[in-house]
Structures are given as structure tokens and as C-alpha cells.
Amino acid sequence: QVSIEKPTFEKYAAYVVELKERNGLKVKTAVRYKDMLKRINAEIGPIKLQDLRPDHLNRLYAKLAEPGQNKKTGGGLSAKTIVEHHRVISTILAQAVKEQLIPFNTAERATPPKLQKHEMDAFEVEEVQAILKALEMEPLKWQVCVQLLIATGARRGEIMGLRWENVDWTENKLYLCENRVYTPESGAISTTLKTGEN
């Protein structure tokens, strides 16, 4: 539980994530939130919610774009990833508004980077043929998995969540009913689908 007496962003963020987990936040989403909150809290964690201003957030977004922030590449975070951080902050502050701890959501007054619109990049026929050819030497389970991914356009976790009872042999249909995800903390677990059922 968080003290109602002027909590810091970090303390309140931990409370909100815990609250959302109790109310059905997906495991992978919770892990991602906590990962982003490490970077966010390093900059704005000690600031009291009431004292948080748009310029604090704008400085955070600029810092996230600096070299060294991306542990894999050594560069800055992409605009898309910075916007994801912005959305986490906005979610936390929206809860604070809802609980009447602050009068407005400061994130709505900040300026995250603009996202460039891009088209989805689909495989060409020749690329699919090359993938299927390369699969011929792989174990059957990987052949089936990749063929299902290509044929259905389903997410990896949705294919991993398939069971025999999800196959309608008469109608030649697959029913996607659960999502299989892995996190280091929980191992492999089944969750609900990202966008509804079947």
C-alpha cells in the first residue's frame, strides 16, 4: 500500500503496477513495465507526484535517446521505445488522477518523440519458399510451428498455446484460445489472448 501523503513517483508506480497485476495485467506486460520503470525511476522516481512537471518528463525522454541507454546496441533508445516509457508514465499518472492525488495527468502535457508511420513488412513469396526449404532439415516440431506461423499470421505465443482440442478436423479450423509466454521469473505460463478469443 502507498501512503496518501504526497507519494514519490517511484513509490506510487510500484503501487499501481501491483494494483494492475491484481486486476489482470498480463505477466509479460508487468515484466515490461518493471523493466521500463528502472530507467524511469532513475530520473524521476524521487520526485513527488504533485511536483512532477512536463519538463521533468521531456528531460527524461531526451536522456533515454542518449547513447548508452540501449544495453544491446550501446545507442539510445528508439522513438518507439521512448513512447512506450511515456505510456507507462501516463498510465501511472492516470491512476493518480483517478485516486484524486493530482489534478491532471502531467504526461498529457509532456512532449514524447513523434513516431514515424511505417508499413508492415511482409515476406515475399520467394522468402517464404526459402524459409520452408531451410526448414526441411529441422525437427518436425519446428517445421510445424513455423508453417503455422506463416500460414495463420498468428503470434508466436498463440501458436505455442495450441492444444489438440483447438483443432477442428472437420471444418479445417484452428481455434486460438490461449497465449503461452515465458518470463525468467515465472517460466512458461498460459495467459489469455491479446485481442480477444478465437
Language-model region placement:
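Short, intrinsically disordered, charge-balanced linker/junction segments flanking boundaries
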Residues: 1-4, 117-118, 193-198
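N-terminal DNA-binding module of tyrosine recombinases/phage integrases
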Residues: 1-59
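Short, surface-exposed helix/turn micro-motifs that flank interaction/cofactor sites
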Residues: 31, 90, 160-161
